[in-house]
UniProtKB/Swiss-Prot annotation:
It comes from the Bacteria. It comes from Burkholderia multivorans (strain ATCC 17616 / 249). Belongs to the D-glutamate cyclase family. The lineage of its organism: Bacteria, Pseudomonadati, Pseudomonadota, Betaproteobacteria, Burkholderiales. PANTHER family: D-GLUTAMATE CYCLASE, MITOCHONDRIAL (PTHR32022:SF10). Gene3D superfamilies: PSTPO5379-like, PSTPO5379-like domain. InterPro entries: D-Glu_cyclase, Putative_hydro-lyase, UPF0317. Pfam families: D-Glu_cyclase (PF07286). This is Putative hydro-lyase Bmul_5125/BMULJ_03391. The keyword Isomerase does not apply. Keywords: Lyase. One of its GO terms (molecular function) is lyase activity. The keyword Lyase applies.
Amino acid sequence: MNPITPSEFRQSVRRGAFRGPTAGHCGPFAQANLAILPDAYAHDFLRFCQANPKACPLLGVGEPGAFRLDVLGDDLDIRTDVPSYNVYRDGRLTERVDSLEALWRDDFVAFAIGCSFSFEDMLAREGIALRHVEEGRNVPMYRTSIPNRRAGVFGGQLVVSMRPMRGADAIRAVQITSRFPGVHGAPIHLGDPRELGIADLGAPDFGDAVTIREGELPVFWACGVTPQTALMEAKLPLAIAHTPGHMLMTDITNASLAVF
């Protein structure tokens, strides 16, 4: 049985009892992407997020060295409460780890970025099928040919997540998710993936491929993995992010993020 509260979920991650993708867990609460980098680069990264708000909507920013972000949860620990972390050295993914306690530095600044998993509970309540949840897979994510707006050393390409839907469901999904810009808002594209520079939906760059049934169209949202393309391009000596699909569970309710 899934933990009922975000705090219980984080505790299960902290104990090592949960290490998988977080889609479908703690439905009424927001999940967050994570980027962690040295303070020397934090101002430029903040400007990068502000320049690319669709992909990088900020939910919280920590002080240098702080591994708690009270705005996200009272008992939250950035170092231990994500099921899996990506470690980048000089722009290359060098390892995945379950904890940052051994890597944490006094100059690290943590950025929490809204995640589209947050609005999936509302889509499901409207009867909109979420194929990756149905199939027990991670959501598929793709690099696009769309460049991000640059800020300092940070650039890279937009990453999108994809959910296949029937046309009527896609329209309803636009209506629902447009209320939540803090977790990526409305889709950026419906239909032909080639218009985004995606050649093969069966070969996602991150996550897992899912079944697209006859009569369905792919629906694409800006994705919080986008900052990882910026971190790779920037080639920082050390930077850390969540492993795609493995999010930080927050105490923020999805309802509180609605703008209308």
